Amino acid sequence: MKIKLLTLAVASLVSVNALAVSIDYRHEMQDTAQAGHKDRLLISHRFANGFGLSSEVKWAQSSADKTPNKPFNEQVSNGTEVVASYVYKFNSVFSIEPGFSLESGSSNNNYRPYLRGRANVTDDLSVALRYRPYFKRNSGNIGKDNTMDKGYTLTGNIDYTFLKDYTIGYELEYKKGTSGKTILSDNDDYDITHNVKLSYKWDKNWKPYVEVGNVSGSETTDERQTRYRVGVQYSF
């Protein structure tokens, strides 16, 4: 059923306006013995009126497979996400984007409305801030105490374009658990993630990129891990 819905969403995006579709593939690994290889494919479109749609599918190495540091091995579904949003531009500097994200796994659905504000400080520098609460329904826990996790994330971004075709960005995300499962990192009810992204606009279609992030490695200790990502975006 999920595959049918994803196929329908992709077909709708492509058929509406093939000149404004972006396809983004990304591979991820962490600095651990297992490496935690993951992949995701994102297809998105922003209409001329500001309305946008995106669909994302994710894969990860099966938890039952203990083969260390082997990408694309025993991959299984790692969830899907569909996002609908609308960008309203006040002027050439300020814009606001309300949206809604539905993230689904094999035993849960995560409902995440959000609001993002963006400012183009200069032609090369932009900043953004997003507030996104989450309401995660754990269908796998029906009949148990914890069937709903609630909280929110605050995400700040700063992006700078240099040498015409290069863009470097820094992202800081703060996640807070308020009810249900609230232990997120180091026995605390919050978690912080840092991420740096460097992209290169090869031409009007291709944009490869690399990312390096610092993420929590445990819910009960102060362990931190380095996360590496490499990907490419194709727009047509």
UniProtKB/Swiss-Prot annotation:
One of its GO terms (cellular component) is pore complex. Keywords: Cell outer membrane, Ion transport, Membrane, Porin, Signal, Sugar transport, Transmembrane, Transmembrane beta strand, Transport, Virulence. The keyword Ribonucleoprotein does not apply. GO terms for molecular function: porin activity; voltage-gated monoatomic ion channel activity. Its main location: membrane. It is found in: Cell outer membrane. One of its GO terms (biological process) is pectin metabolic process. Residues 1-20 form the signal peptide. InterPro entries: Bact_OM_Channel_sf, Oligogalacturonate-sp_porin. Induction: Induced by pectin or pectin derivatives. Controlled by KdgR, ExuR, PecS and catabolite repression via CRP. PANTHER family: OUTER MEMBRANE PROTEIN, OUTER MEMBRANE PROTEIN-RELATED-RELATED. Belongs to the oligogalacturonate-specific porin KdgM (TC 1.B.35) family. Porin specific for oligogalacturonides. Also required for full virulence. Monomer. This is Oligogalacturonate-specific porin KdgM. The gene is kdgM.
